[in-house]
A protein has these predicted regions:
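N-terminal hydrophobic/helix-forming segments and targeting peptides
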Residues: 1-183
Length: 183
């Protein structure tokens, strides 16, 4: 058994895998816990808001061909490192952490849907701050451009923008553009 606690993950969409290596990562999402009855569970939106994980990249002497082809298996090469394990750490260390952030006992957790995210703040880059460095620029810049266009236009009728999730996987989810939200 390895002496560290790892988190099993599932990749979503068109992931640029090497971009997630050696970055401080945090965890946010929804935790479902026991409620007043079996038919009324509680929902908690959580965000650790601090670096709690990293996906370490092996040193060059451990992978001599890394510069020739950056091929990473998500289930074996990209498991986020969360903690060092000692004799007192149990296998459910992550459930304990979720229980702590929700202020409940770990046994009350029924389910969770969580996401890792890079904890690096966006910044201006360049001699004249003419560039923006940030994660998810493809989505954020599109939303920003749409919002600015909507704010500065002077339409005679109704103007709106539609922003959907899941375009990376074909928009065919319940909240995607190909869903039944808009006929």
């Amino acid at each position: 058994k390895p002496p560290y606690g790892l988190l099993n993950i599932e990749a979503y969409g068109g992931l640029i895998r090497h971009a997630w290596l050696d970055r401080p990562l945090s965890v946010a999402g929804k935790v479902i816990t026991k409620g007043p009855s079996a038919f009324a569970p509680q929902s908690h939106l959580i965000n650790f808001e601090k670096p709690v994980a990293v996906i370490p990249e092996p040193a060059i002497h451990m992978n001599r061909t890394v510069n020739e082809s950056a091929s990473f298996n998500i289930q074996t090469n990209m498991l986020p490192l969360l903690t060092l394990l000692d004799k007192d750490t149990t296998d459910d260390f992550f459930l304990s952490a979720l229980g702590n952030i929700c202020h409940i006992e770990k046994d009350e957790i029924l389910a969770y849907d969580l996401n890792l995210y890079p904890l690096i703040q966006p910044t201006y880059i360049g001699l004249n701050n003419e560039f923006i460095g940030s994660s998810r620029l493809d989505n954020l810049t599109s939303v920003d451009a749409c919002m600015k266009a909507l704010e500065t236009s002077h339409p005679q009728g109704l103007s709106l923008i539609c922003l959907f999730d899941n375009e990376e996987v074909g928009s065919r989810t319940k909240q995607g553009a190909a869903s039944f939200i808009i006929p």
